[in-house]
Amino acid sequence: MAILNILEFPDPRLRTIAKPVDVVDDSIRQLVDDMFETMYDAPGIGLAATQVNVHKRVVVMDLSEDKSEPRVFINPEFESLTDEMDQYQEGCLSVPGFYENVDRPQKVKIKALDRDGQPFELIAEGLLAVCIQHECDHLNGKLFVDYLSNLKRDRIKKKLEKQHRQRA
């Protein structure tokens, strides 16, 4: 396993739309393993392949406190099951150090493939619903900062660009 480099906003590669996985093979399972290692190391609760510059529709997440509930979503799709919205303070490994409130549908139905390529469906609410929507956004080239005002997004962008310059 390997820890992968996480792209940071405003890197344009984060805007790439990920391609579906045709076959879940050993290379995809290795990617999943590397993504889990990267996510746990960061630490985070979710990671999309786009964030590690692999433009395939793969998401990993683990909402547990003790890394005991790893979840894999390959080619995930979701649909909202309610018009009711929940507001959560979201953060992102690609937007480090920033947390902002985002409104999202509070209940969604997810369809995806698991680590072995087997299809499954899941009804998600609360943090799981927020997380899957956030990670699916990554696969579509969208970030949580896109839900913010231009002023907030530009402020975050400028601060991260300054941090990047200071590290260079």
From Swiss-Prot:
CDD domains: Pep_deformylase. The active site is at E135. Transmembrane segments: none annotated. Binds 1 Fe(2+) ion. Fe cation binds at C92, H134, H138. GO terms for molecular function: metal ion binding; peptide deformylase activity. Pfam families: Pep_deformylase (PF01327). It catalyses: N-terminal N-formyl-L-methionyl-[peptide] + H2O = N-terminal L-methionyl-[peptide] + formate. Its EC number is 3.5.1.88. Its cofactor is Fe(2+). Removes the formyl group from the N-terminal Met of newly synthesized proteins. Requires at least a dipeptide for an efficient rate of reaction. N-terminal L-methionine is a prerequisite for activity but the enzyme has broad specificity at other positions. PANTHER family: PEPTIDE DEFORMYLASE. Belongs to the polypeptide deformylase family. This is Peptide deformylase.
